[in-house]
């Protein structure tokens, strides 16, 4: 079966800084396309979508351009979801510097590390709404408790396509369904949202075995 990996990460710590991963031994290392190709060998992955990995803000534009350049090389990278900071007044200027590349598909702002008020700020909704004009989607990277905030953003920008990452990060390991279940049902009624079934095995915790895969499949039914 041919596979499209819709959530690929790459990072080069020799070029860019990702402060969030410094304390995580498994992640605090450079991982390039060559490493990825080795990891997927024999898995029939035909295409991939690179999703930004919350690079430190001073490197945001340079890292986005770097990934877009990689997508022009001989590899399966067919789509790029770039990082962005819609809370800033200069967000449109940033977009104008990266739009036009055929592999650029969307923007993501990691929100699970940010206060909820960031999304309610004067620029955030206005700037996310701009994405409709550029034909770009917006990835919702939120915790389960932030789903109501995400829902408000979705309803405020009806012309923008939203991708809910990792099923809204339910508490899989703790087997706590509610209020995540109620919120996921509400957001599922919005025609401009699709849900990315990703990250659930990781949310199950270690070990990553068949039992946890079965648990992840059960949660994805919602």
Model region roles, listed by residue range:
Residues 171-222:
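H/E-rich (His + Asp/Glu) clusters that bind or coordinate divalent metals
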Residues 45, 103-105, 160:
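Loop/turn elements at helix/coil->beta-strand transitions in domains of secreted/extracellular proteins
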Residues 1, 37-38, 92-100, 148-155, ...:
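Short amphipathic alpha-helices and their capping/turn segments at secondary-structure boundaries
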Residues 1-68:
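An N-terminally biased module of ancient metal coordination in phosphate/nucleic-acid-related enzymes
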Residues 61-146, 152-155, 194-203, 207-210:
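Active-site gating/metal-coordination segments in enzymes
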């Amino acid at each position: 079966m041919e596979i499209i990996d819709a959530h690929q990460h790459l990072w080069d710590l020799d070029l860019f800084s990702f402060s969030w991963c410094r304390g995580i031994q498994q992640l605090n290392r450079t991982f390039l396309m060559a490493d990825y190709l080795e990891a997927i060998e024999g898995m029939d992955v035909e295409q991939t979508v690179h999703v930004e990995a919350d690079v430190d803000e001073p490197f945001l534009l340079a890292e986005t351009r770097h990934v877009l350049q990689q997508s022009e090389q001989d590899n399966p990278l067919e789509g790029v979801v770039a990082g962005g900071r819609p809370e800033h007044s200069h967000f449109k200027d940033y977009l104008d510097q990266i739009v036009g590349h055929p592999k650029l598909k969307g923007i993501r702002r990691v929100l699970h590390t940010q206060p909820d008020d960031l999304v309610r700020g004067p620029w955030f909704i206005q700037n996310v709404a701009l994405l409709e004009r550029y034909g770009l989607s917006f990835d919702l990277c939120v915790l389960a408790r932030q789903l109501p905030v995400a829902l408000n953003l979705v309803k405020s920008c009806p012309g923008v396509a939203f991708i809910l990452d990792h099923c809204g990060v339910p508490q899989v390991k703790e087997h706590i369904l509610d209020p995540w279940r109620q919120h996921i049902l509400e957001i599922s009624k919005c025609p401009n949202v699709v849900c990315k079934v990703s990250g659930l095995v990781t949310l199950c915790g270690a070990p990553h075995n068949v039992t946890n895969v079965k648990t992840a499949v059960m949660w994805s039914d919602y």
